[in-house]
A protein has these predicted regions:
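N-terminal small/glycine-rich loop or linker at the start of catalytic domains
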Residues: 1-4, 72-83, 231-233
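Histidine-acidic metal/acid-base catalytic patches
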Residues: 1-29, 107, 135, 160, ...
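Active-site-proximal loop/turn and secondary-structure-junction residues that shape catalytic pockets
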Residues: 9-11, 34-36, 79-81, 115-119, ...
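Active-site acidic/histidine proton-transfer and metal-coordination neighborhood
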Residues: 17, 59-68, 80-185, 195, ...
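Short beta-strand segments at enzyme active-site cores
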Residues: 30-33, 72-76, 109-115, 147-152, ...
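Glycine-rich, proline-tolerant flexible connector loops at the mouths of alpha/beta enzymes
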Residues: 33-60, 121
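Short, flexible/disordered intra-domain loops and linkers
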Residues: 40-52, 158-167, 277-283
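Glycine-/proline-rich flexible loop or hinge segments
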Residues: 41-48, 76-84
Length: 300
């Protein structure tokens, strides 16, 4: 298993600088953020402009990675592919296709996204809509030698307060979509499952046939706040770097391996204690790498 990180934690820095940080901190892989340059929401970045990438640009990026001994585990564009507004949905789906095209140029086999949610429809209707939308998107990706994967953040409050903005955030929803779109992969993130009360270790073991990528992000329950703040509200938990929260990482990694996954563990840095100035962000990534690296098997 190799360690990487999602580059969305460094939105203001160019890819060349991100690569330098990765090699200095001991990472081997990068999950490269590919949101549009005009993106406005948090936890996003545009380290590859997929709208303008051509073969020459792809060759330059491949060379940068190779010179530093790194590889790209996936391209990342996590947005609402089921947006209720047809124009917004067309833009999101179109950018996802461009991200797939970029992956093909770069020789990258995975592109990550969210399913999203159309809040004008029922959950059952959304599953059927997702099957249609992702049936077309996975076919587009497959024709280009790329596999789409979905991540399981519920995105509560993304479109409406107290409401999940991402349809497929737990095993029950995964089952419904994978039954309809079997070529879709899963980028499993245990941090969301933990605060939702879903067993992340069982999910890692039981969904090995679908897991193609894994995020490393921890969760800390703020118990004094939770004594006053109900489950449906926020502020009673927060994301942390691996090892600074409550997840049992040896157990999670073992469950992944037992389920048949042994590829990339990609740190998603959303730790508020280690955000802000570049040296704080870098420090968080270094802490995560130092904690996770001893837990992984490194063949001689």
């Amino acid at each position: 298993m190799k360690l990487g990180f999602l580059t969305a934690c460094m939105p203001e820095r160019p890819l060349s600088e991100v690569v330098h940080v990765a090699t200095t901190a001991g990472y081997q892989m990068l999950e490269v953020a590919c949101w549009p340059r005009s993106g406005e929401r948090d936890h996003h970045a545009s380290h590859i402009d997929v709208a303008t990438l051509d073969e020459a640009g792809a060759r330059e990026i491949r060379g940068l990675m190779e010179r530093q001994g790194l590889a790209i585990s996936a391209l990342a564009y996590y947005e609402n592919n089921l947006a209720a507004d047809p124009n917004e949905r067309a833009v999101v789906n179109g950018h996802l296709r461009k991200t797939v095209d970029a992956a093909q140029l770069l020789g990258v086999g995975l592109v990550g996204t969210f399913v999203g949610n159309d809040l004008s429809k029922t959950p059952t209707e959304n599953v059927e809509e997702a099957a249609t939308v992702f049936g077309e998107l996975t076919a587009y990706a497959g024709e280009r030698g790329v596999r789409l994967m979905i991540e399981n953040c519920p995105m509560v409050g993304w479109q409406r307060p107290y409401t999940p903005g991402n349809l497929c955030y737990a095993p029950a929803q995964w089952d419904a979509l994978f039954a309809r779109v079997p070529d879709l992969g899963l980028n499993i993130d245990p941090s969301h499952l933990y605060w939702l009360g879903v067993d992340p270790y069982a999910a890692a073991r039981d969904y090995g046939a679908h897991i193609v990528h894994a995020h490393a992000k921890d969760t800390e329950i703020l118990h004094q706040r939770h004594a006053r703040i109900p489950v449906l509200d926020d502020g009673w938990w927060r994301y942390r770097m691996p090892g600074l929260g409550e997840l049992n990482w040896p157990r999670f990694i073992s469950a992944l391996q037992e389920g048949g996954y042994d590829d990339v563990l990609s740190t998603e840095h959303e730790d508020p204690v280690w955000e802000g100035a570049p040296d704080r962000v870098d420090g968080g990534l270094i802490l995560g790498q130092r904690f996770l690296a001893p837990l992984l098997y490194h063949p001689s």
